[in-house]
From Swiss-Prot:
GO terms for cellular component: cytoplasm; microtubule. This is Tubulin beta-1 chain. One of its GO terms (molecular function) is metal ion binding. The keyword DNA-binding does not apply. Residues 428-447 are annotated as: Disordered. Mg(2+) binds at residue 69. Keywords: Cytoplasm, Cytoskeleton, GTP-binding, Magnesium, Metal-binding, Microtubule, Nucleotide-binding. Belongs to the tubulin family. Its cofactor is Mg(2+). One of its GO terms (biological process) is microtubule-based process. The keyword Protein biosynthesis does not apply.
Length: 447
């Protein structure tokens, strides 16, 4: 079977990861001790995508938990599903990265990375046919961003032909946890551009907005935000875990979603959004799902897709529904909003359908968009980066760990290149001169 090895790094990564395991354990009928109490064979049919079967019929998540301080790990361990993880798969340091990317990437993290890779190797060896890796982390802190990207590049070296998928929480425009977020995020993006196949950009502010506006929560907690993220993660991986009429795996997704290797930053969305306490009392229809799914208010990254154009889109529907209706609705959206889809990639919307809906819903849809509007997010980080870097503010924390200013300059220009690549394809049309395209291609290759 096509297994996925899951890695969660840093505080944010571990909290999102823990939520993710709660949700998919629930979907597969697995209780907090790892025992199966489900009611359908379908739950077990492809359970080994995410779980190892241990002796006595226990199911153990194929998860590796990494952090540079023990705090978050302890709270995961004492959380609702804390006992389901394999104890050897908790790898943590004592010192913490102190929100410093350099500590995560070069000093503290580099000391711990070999013991993490040993665990990764163990997990990969117990796989029958490893499909790829998924990492949950944030880009604003020290461990998830610095050590997370270090892990990615090390795993890339060892498993070059496996898909590398990340769920990356990007610093928000308004909600900021740390002053040095722009530095950490820019240095991380510099790595992600080169080393991942698919990166889902998730943004706390967008999640807050969804909680306020759609879910009507007056004071959203991180628990609520993480619940939204885990819904998306569960949706993206549905096709791998359950049989469906039209299946997609990580690689198919990458092939359909990434027209140019550097442009692999996606905006996720989910429908129907329901507040945690209130299970909905109305029947959902496919048209409603598609409508809500493409709605700008539904995006989990703080970018407005109406400010750019979609290069590609993937939609994953869950539940019993007519394929014909799904296809009609998707076409309908594309025809009505054709100006928001680039015309030089015909049929750029891929749909997958899985028969099994999430707990408590008749049907749901997960949206993944590769839109040029994501450049807003990178522009925002880049502006904040430049403002601080121009004055060399806070730099001593990084140079003190052995980093060089050059590395900052490189990361900055790589991010700016990314923005201009998105911009270039936003403006490109189908009938421009081919010569112009070749020159551009050449430039991109030279960069």
């Amino acid at each position: 079977m096509r297994e996925i090895v899951h890695i969660q790094a840093g505080q944010c990564g571990n909290q999102i990861g823990a939520k993710f395991w709660e949700i998919i354990s629930d979907e597969h009928g697995i209780d907090p001790t790892g025992a199966y109490h489900g009611d359908s064979d379908l739950q077990l049919e492809r359970i080994n995508v995410y779980y190892n079967e241990a002796s006595g019929g226990k199911y153990v998540p194929r998860a590796i938990l990494v952090d540079l301080e023990p705090g978050t790990m302890d709270s995961v361990r004492s959380g609702p599903f804390g006992q389901i993880f394999r104890p050897d798969n908790f790898v943590f340091g004592q010192s913490g990265a102190g929100n410093n990317w350099a500590k995560g990437h070069y000093t503290e993290g580099a000391e711990l990375v070999d013991s993490v890779l040993d665990v990764v190797r163990k997990e990969a060896e117990s796989c029958d046919c490893l499909q790829g890796f998924q990492l949950t982390h944030s880009l604003g802190g020290g461990t998830g961003s610095g050590m997370g990207t270090l892990l990615i590049s090390k795993i890339r070296e060892e498993y070059p032909d496996r898909i590398m998928n990340t769920y990356s929480v990007v610093p928000s425009p308004k909600v900021s946890d740390t002053v040095v977020e722009p530095y950490n995020a820019t240095l991380s993006v510099h790595q992600l551009v080169e080393n991942t196949d698919e990166t889902y950009c998730i943004d706390n502010e967008a999640l807050y907005d969804i909680c306020f506006r759609t879910l009507k929560l007056s004071t959203p907690t991180y628990g609520d935000l993480n619940h939204l993220v885990s819904l998306t993660m569960s949706g993206v991986t549905t096709c791998l875990r359950f049989p469906g009429q039209l299946n997609a795996d990580l690689r198919k997704l990458a092939v359909n979603m990434v027209p140019f290797p550097r442009l692999h930053f996606f905006m996720p969305g989910f429908a129907p959004l329901t507040s945690r306490g209130s299970q909905q009392y109305r029947a959902l229809t496919v048209p409603e799902l598609t409508q809500q799914m493409f709605d700008a208010k539904n995006m989990m990254a703080a970018c407005d897709p109406r400010h750019g154009r979609y290069l590609t889109v993937a939609a994953i529907f869950r539940g019993r529904m007519s394929m014909k209706e799904v296809d009609e609705q998707m076409l309908n959206i594309q025809n009505k909003n054709s100006s928001y889809f680039v015309e030089w990639i015909p049929n750029n919307v891929k749909t997958a359908v899985c028969d099994i809906p999430p707990r408590g819903l008749k049907m749901s849809a997960t949206f993944i968009g590769n839109s040029t509007a994501i450049q807003e997010l990178f522009k925002r980080i880049s502006e904040q980066f430049t403002a601080m870097f121009r004055r060399k503010a806070f730099l001593h924390w990084y140079t003190g760990e052995g980093m060089d200013e050059m590395e900052f300059t490189e990361a900055e220009s790589n991010m700016n290149d990314l923005v201009s690549e998105y911009q270039q394809y936003q403006e490109a049309t189908a009938d421009e001169d081919a010569e112009f395209d070749e020159e551009q291609e050449q430039e991109i290759e030279d960069n």
